[in-house]
């Protein structure tokens, strides 16, 4: 008993001693966490270089764009063929995807040989062989008459400019077919299929095996955004933000990048950690100086690395008592499968004995322990290096998402990861230490990369079909120049109807005379009050206008709110509230006393019989105060002043906000003869020749016409360009059937159009995973400011997602792109329609004056015009295209329509003293 214990103790001591000797001998292969973090940092830099246009040509890690832009979302379906070429055999699969109740994938496959004479022959021979095998497969499955979509897994480095094209950069593994490097493998395969002529195939996608792995796993777990292969070779791919990929146009969304990380170190960046054994292995390989990282990591080389170590240690008398056999000296006699067998927990030592005996050495027990430890060091180094490079990818994903902690899934395939008894456990453990702020789930690819190629094809098909349906819907919003010319022509017709006495009563565009007959001439002088009412808030202003050499306008104002109960109460209550606020303002300014002239900006449709009289036609914008419609608002204001008996006012002018805007700008720029508002609502006014204004007597001079163009189309004349979404928005509005042109343009409604399109797309499964959330059902959720923010060129998709999240909409990257597209299409149409309307106005002025060319300025106000990043540019462009004989300048109204009301009042006071203009 004691003898046995002593023997065991002696053996353990011997074993420990031998392990220490080997640790010392292979010290350079044992990498500390400090070194691994340094490698992680180096690889991160290499990735950045590969993505950069400037550094990519010389980068060793090529970071190849794959043009795979989306992982499966679970709605894919169809019948597909997958080809998988990249190893000793060639696999063809038929993959059927359906999701009637539970989504499932059924697969049938056949394996075909790729003999040495074919992989080392010509490219023509190779692709003829692939086409023959595909023909045989389709014959067996009785699908030769079907033109099924084909996904092609081609596991070699390729440069792609689209998903159905792949130009081979260089052969790897044992492939050497001539005439293929630098050629598009899809064209070569199509040529071979065409040559046979007995079947047809539609090659939709070419993918690398790593991408195939990611897509296979992505079908089961939509969090999967990394693919990893650790087998004969090694590689990884991941979903990168398009804005970081210089080699591909566009910055919206994501694209899968095939890193081709096997070449990491080919530029010398890993020389400090490569050992003499790595260098010897490289010298004897088919591609010296290439794929240096892969040669330190992958299954193709691991057994050979161990063999080289055994030979050197035996030569130095540290193993096998210095015995060296011909078998031990023969390359390929010690395989990675031997490494896996030797590292097994229980039978590892026994396996070592059998394998070493096969090599002709007669190993002692200590030799077997030593060889097991050598295998452990080599395979552990591999796991550590892969953990470092994968750690760099995870850090990059985390940084891209701007999140403190990353949760993601990595799809994995490869014999080394799957078959080696300790590899995956060691690899996961190291990764957790290197990237503690990432929670990573590893998902084993059960079906190989063929299913992945089919899934890429299925996703490409789904996206193409979705794209077709989305484009079909959005096409109704895309207006051709011909359509816009027609809108311009129709508005001209409506304008003529509104101006004529006999047709005015039937006209929808009312063309209301404003009795403003002159723009400021610079002689206006004095102190004026202005009242600006057009929404839930209103302003009272004191405007001090000074003429002379230095014309100045000094303004003081105070903003007051109108409670909802007053907006929707009685007319007396509304005007009493307004007068109460004026009283407060006069006290605030210390000017209560003298009777002051007042201009009243009243932004609702009014029929005017004089400058100081405006009969309200109808309330808009949520106002419902009773006993106002059909009454003169100036009289209602005067009556309320009398009831208060505190002060007196001289109501000189009732002005629409559009007219006020024109006058404000005309004070600065005398060529300003048009006013435009594009904000919550939209409207325009312009200086019309009196001879054309049949509703007012007199033919001399001009008068500003308040078009009230928001009602354009209320008679059905725009029904052919109104979409179903416009109709829904109109139906649920407060004034159904009214202001139809406004509802296609103004900020009050654009968000609603967008929301309804998003609901439609969500129902069809294109958005938000098909889930219509409560916020999306909420009317008014998309305010103009959100549309402006979402469409801003400066905003990355992450920020767009943040805005949508703020609105309670959890979106993916693809969702954000689609939302941005919808916003863009809706706002572009609004700008174009507004431009068509403005083109009609400027052409009318030009024709009125019989000019070959008109130079005119438009005074503009409104949040949509001011804040939206593209609206003004598109509108200006449309006006230019539709009215080429007019040069139109746009001047932003800085001081709102209140200043305009004061100026109109000043002009009115000036004209009172000029009897020639009555």
From Swiss-Prot:
Subcellular location per the Swiss-Prot or TrEMBL entry: Mitochondrion outer membrane; Cytoplasm, Cytosol
Tissue: Expressed in flagella of epididymal sperm.
Binding site for D-glucose 6-phosphate 2: 532-536, 603, 657, 680, 861-863, 897
Regulation: Hexokinase is an allosteric enzyme inhibited by its product D-glucose 6-phosphate. Hexokinase activity is inhibited by N-acetyl-D-glucosamine.
Membrane topology label: Peripheral membrane protein
Stretch list, region Hexokinase small subdomain 1: 73-207
Reaction(s) catalysed by this chain's protein: a D-hexose + ATP = a D-hexose 6-phosphate + ADP + H(+); D-fructose + ATP = D-fructose 6-phosphate + ADP + H(+); D-glucose + ATP = D-glucose 6-phosphate + ADP + H(+); D-mannose + ATP = D-mannose 6-phosphate + ADP + H(+)
InterPro entries attached to this UniProt entry: ATPase_NBD (IPR043129), Hexokinase (IPR001312), Hexokinase_BS (IPR019807), Hexokinase_C (IPR022673), Hexokinase_N (IPR022672)
Binding of D-glucose 6-phosphate 1, residues: 84-88, 209, 232, 413-415, 449
Subunit structure: Monomer. Interacts with RABL2/RABL2A; binds preferentially to GTP-bound RABL2. Interacts with VDAC1. The HK1-VDAC1 complex interacts with ATF2. Interacts (via N-terminal spermatogenic cell-specific region) with PFKM (via C-terminus). Interacts with SMAD5.
Protein name: Hexokinase-1
């Amino acid at each position: 008993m004691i003898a046995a214990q002593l023997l065991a103790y002696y053996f353990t001591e011997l074993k420990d001693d031998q392990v220490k000797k080997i640790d010392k001998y292979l010290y350079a292969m044992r990498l500390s966490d400090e070194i691994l973090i340094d490698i992680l940092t180096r690889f991160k830099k290499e990735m950045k270089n590969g993505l950069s246009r400037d550094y990519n040509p010389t980068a060793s890690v090529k970071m190849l764009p794959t043009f795979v832009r989306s992982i499966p979302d679970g709605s894919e379906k169809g019948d597909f063929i997958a080809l998988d070429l990249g190893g000793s055999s060639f696999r063809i699969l038929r993959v059927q995807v359906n999701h009637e109740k539970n989504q499932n994938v059924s697969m049938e496959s056949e394996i075909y040989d790729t003999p040495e004479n074919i992989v080392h022959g010509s490219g023509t021979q190779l692709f003829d062989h692939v086409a023959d095998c595909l023909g045989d497969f389709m014959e067996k499955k009785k699908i030769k008459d079907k033109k099924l979509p084909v996904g092609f897994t081609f596991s070699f480095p390729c440069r792609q400019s689209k998903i159905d094209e792949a130009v081979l950069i260089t052969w790897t593994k044992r492939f050497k077919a001539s005439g293929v490097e630098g050629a598009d493998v899809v064209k070569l395969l199509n040529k071979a299929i065409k040559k046979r002529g007995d079947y047809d195939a539609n090659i939709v996608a070419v993918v690398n095996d790593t991408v195939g792995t990611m897509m296979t796993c992505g079908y089961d777990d939509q969090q999967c955004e990394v693919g990893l292969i650790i087998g004969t070779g090694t590689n990884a791919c991941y979903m990168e933000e398009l804005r970081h990929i210089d080699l591909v146009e566009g910055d919206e969304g994501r694209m899968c990048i095939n890193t081709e990380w096997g070449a990491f170190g080919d530029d010398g960046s890993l020389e400090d950690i490569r050992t003499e054994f790595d260098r010897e292995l490289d010298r004897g390989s088919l591609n010296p100086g290439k794929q240096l990282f892969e040669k330190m990591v992958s299954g193709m080389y691991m057994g050979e690395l161990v063999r080289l170590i055994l030979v050197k240690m035996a030569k130095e008398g540290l193993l096998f008592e210095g015995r060296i056999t011909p078998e031990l000296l023969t390359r390929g006699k010690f395989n990675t499968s031997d490494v896996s067998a030797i590292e097994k927990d229980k039978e590892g030592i026994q396996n070592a004995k059998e394998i070493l005996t096969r090599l002709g050495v007669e190993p002692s027990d200590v030799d077997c322990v030593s060889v097991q430890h050598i295998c452990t060091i080599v395979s552990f180094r591999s796991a550590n290096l892969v953990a470092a490079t994968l750690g760099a990818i995870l850090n990059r994903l985390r940084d891209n998402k701007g999140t403190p902690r990353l949760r993601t899934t990595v799809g994995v395939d490869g014999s080394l990861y799957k078959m080696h008894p300790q590899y995956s456990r060691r690899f996961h453990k190291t990764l957790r230490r290197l990237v503690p702020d990432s929670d990573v789930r590893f998902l084993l690819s059960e079906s190989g990369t063929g299913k992945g190629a089919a899934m890429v094809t299925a996703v490409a098909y789904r996206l193409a079909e979705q794209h077709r349906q989305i484009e079909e819907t959005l096409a109704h919003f895309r207006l051709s120049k011909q359509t816009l010319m027609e809108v311009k022509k129709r508005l001209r017709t409506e304008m003529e109807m509104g101006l004529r006495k006999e047709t005015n009563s039937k006209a929808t565009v009312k063309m209301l005379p404003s009795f403003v007959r002159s723009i400021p001439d610079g002689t206006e002088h004095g102190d004026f009050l202005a009242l600006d009412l057009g929404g839930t808030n209103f302003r009272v202003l004191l405007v001090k206008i000074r003429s002379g050499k230095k014309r100045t306008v000094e303004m003081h104002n105070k903003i007051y709110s109108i409670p909802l109960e007053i907006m929707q109460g009685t007319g007396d209550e509304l005007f009493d509230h307004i007068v109460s606020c004026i009283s407060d303002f006069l006290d605030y300014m210390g000017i209560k006393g003298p009777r002051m002239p007042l201009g009243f900006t009243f932004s609702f449709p009014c029929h005017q019989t004089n400058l100081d009289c405006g009969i309200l036609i109808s309330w808009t914008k949520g106002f419902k105060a009773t006993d106002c419609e059909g009454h003169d608002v100036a009289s209602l204001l005067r009556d309320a002043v009398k009831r208060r008996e505190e002060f007196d006012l001289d109501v000189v002018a009732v002005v629409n906000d559009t007219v006020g805007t024109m006058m404000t700008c005309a004070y600065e720029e005398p060529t300003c003869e048009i006013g435009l508002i594009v904000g919550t609502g939209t409207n325009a006014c312009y200086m019309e020749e009196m001879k054309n204004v049949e509703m007012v007597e007199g033919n001399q001079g001009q008068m500003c016409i308040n078009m009230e163009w928001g009602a354009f189309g209320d008679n059905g004349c725009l029904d052919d360009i109104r979409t179903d979404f416009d109709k829904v928005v109109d139906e649920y509005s407060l004034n159904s059937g009214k202001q139809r042109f406004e509802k296609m343009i103004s900020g009050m409604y654009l968000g609603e159009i967008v929301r309804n399109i998003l609901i439609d797309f969500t129902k069809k499964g294109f958005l938000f995973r098909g889930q219509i959330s409560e916020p999306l059902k909420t009317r008014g959720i998309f305010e103009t400011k959100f549309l402006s923010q979402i469409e801003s060129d400066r905003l990355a998709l992450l920020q767009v997602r943040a805005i949508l999240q703020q609105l309670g909409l959890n979106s993916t990257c693809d969702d954000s792109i689609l939302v941005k597209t919808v916003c863009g299409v809706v706002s572009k149409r609004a700008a174009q329609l507004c431009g068509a309307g403005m083109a009609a106005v400027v052409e009318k002025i030009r024709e009125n004056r019989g000019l070959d060319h008109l130079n005119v300025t438009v005074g503009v106000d409104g949040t949509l015009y001011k804040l939206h990043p593209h609206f003004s540019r598109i509108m200006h462009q449309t006006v230019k295209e539709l009215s080429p004989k007019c040069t139109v300048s746009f001047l932003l109204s800085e001081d709102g329509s209140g200043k305009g009301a004061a100026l109109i009042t000043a002009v009115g006071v000036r004209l009172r003293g000029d009897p020639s203009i009555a």
